[in-house]
UniProtKB/Swiss-Prot annotation:
This is L-lactate dehydrogenase A. Pathway: Fermentation; pyruvate fermentation to lactate; (S)-lactate from pyruvate: step 1/1. InterPro entries: L-lactate/malate_DH (IPR001557), L-lactate_DH (IPR011304), L-lactate_DH_AS (IPR018177), Lactate/malate_DH_C (IPR022383), Lactate/malate_DH_N (IPR001236), Lactate_DH/Glyco_Ohase_4_C (IPR015955), NAD(P)-bd_dom_sf (IPR036291). NCBIfam families: L-LDH-NAD. It holds the Pfam family Ldh_1_C. It catalyses: (S)-lactate + NAD(+) = pyruvate + NADH + H(+). It comes from the Eukaryota. Keywords: NAD, Oxidoreductase, Stress response. It comes from Hordeum vulgare (Barley). Tetramer that arise from random association of LDH-A and LDH-B. It is an enzyme of class 1 (oxidoreductase). The active site is at H215. Substrate binds at R128, N160, R191, T270. The keyword Oxidoreductase applies. The lineage of its organism: Eukaryota, Viridiplantae, Streptophyta, Embryophyta, Tracheophyta.
Length: 356
């Protein structure tokens, strides 16, 4: 007797099943075939724009996880760039075979994924708007040449403020929204999972929990999303721990948001966690893993956000070789949805101040 090996063999129409969970972003591209449909492996090239602490942590993590056959590094400081490239090249005997190059934007030609970490540093006393405008000026120099050299690439923005700069990169690149992604709250969600895992004494990989919205002070913790080992956990946590009141929950959310500030206060900058976070996104994208990550996407039309507001913020999205393959339809409380809409309104207002 033949045993069914898939839902379709059991009579389910599995072809469109994902549409019940995910919706495409506006201005998106159709999904690419799964990697199993590609007959021969092609070489993979990743470019990292910005060779600072974050950029080099990302490059190092990509190397050790064997995610690319070639890495191109670009930075405004040529001596530092050459030093960083040489330092990695000297480790060739201990790493998978990879070609490392680095000068200007021309070395990014034919990239599969371009990761932008470059950003202007805030001057003491400088307003947030002025800093944002200087970052836009920097992106005008970075993004159009990158888009010209790699017109089919995926663009992953890591620079802060990541949600607004992802919007800027989308506008300047001319790419469809499905191919422009911000690192968003992927790392915030990892910190959220870590805190819950520490409390329950379980492995963080067995915890599922999302932070969504703006990557910043107004990020939204989706408490109902918490599961441990696939089992919903928030209700049992509240039932067994009376201390899990609204004030305590807000304290946990603030601890997640403040995690980066704590690290910066202790060592001066963040690097390793964001390196692993971005590498996980690169793997999901380039290996067509179709994993769900909370990343900054074009959120128009989701959860009551106006269709007319072109704003990027983090929502759980399915990632694959085509970029954003769909955004999960979360079941939010009205309070959570209202917080998300407030974040969207603030981000939209910031975007309107830019000359794009």
């Amino acid at each position: 007797m033949h045993k069914a090996s898939s839902l379709s063999e059991l009579g389910f129409d599995a072809g469109g099943a994902s549409s019940g969970f995910f919706r495409p972003v506006a201005d998106g591209c159709p999904a690419t075939p799964t990697s199993s449909a590609v007959p021969h492996r092609r070489l993979t090239k990743i470019s990292v724009i910005g060779a600072g602490n974050v950029g080099m942590a990302i490059a190092q993590t990509i190397l050790t996880q064997n995610l690319a056959d070639e890495i191109a590094l670009v930075d405004a400081l040529p001596d530092k760039l050459r030093g960083e490239a040489l330092d990695l090249q000297h480790a060739a005997a201990f790493l998978p075979r990879v070609r490392i190059s680095g000068t200007d934007a021309a070395v990014t030609k034919n990239s599969d994924l371009v990761i932008v970490t470059a950003g202007a540093r805030q001057i003491p006393g400088e307003t947030r708007l002025n800093l944002l405008q200087r970052n836009v000026a920097l992106y005008r120099k970075i993004v159009p040449p990158v888009a010209e050299h790699s017109p089919d690439a995926l663009l992953l923005v890591v620079s802060n403020p990541v949600d607004v700069l992802t919007y800027v990169a989308w506008k300047l690149s001319g790419f469809p929204a499905s191919r422009v992604i911000g690192s968003g709250t992927n790392l915030d969600s990892s910190r959220f999972r870590f805190l819950i895992a520490e409390h329950l004494d379980v492995n963080a990989q067995d915890v599922q929990a999302y932070m969504v919205g703006e990557h910043g002070d107004s990020s939204v913790a989706i408490w109902s999303s918490i599961s441990v080992g696939g089992m919903p956990a928030f209700k049992s946590l509240r039932d067994s721990h009376r201390s899990f009141d609204e004030a305590a929950l807000e304290g946990i959310r603030r601890a997640v948001v403040g995690g980066a500030y704590e690290v910066i206060g202790l060592k001066g900058y963040t690097s390793w966690a964001i390196g692993y976070s971005v590498a996980s996104l690169a793997a999901s994208l380039l290996r067509d893993q179709r994993r769900v990550h909370p990343v900054s996407v074009l959120a128009s039309g989701f959860h009551g956000i106006s269709d007319g507001h072109e704003v990027f913020l983090s929502l759980p999205a399915r990632l694959g070789r085509g970029g954003i393959l769909g955004v999960a339809e979360m079941d939010l409380t009205e309070a959570e949805a209202a917080q998300l809409r407030r974040s969207a309104k603030t981000l939209w207002e910031n975007c309107q101040l830019l000359d794009l």
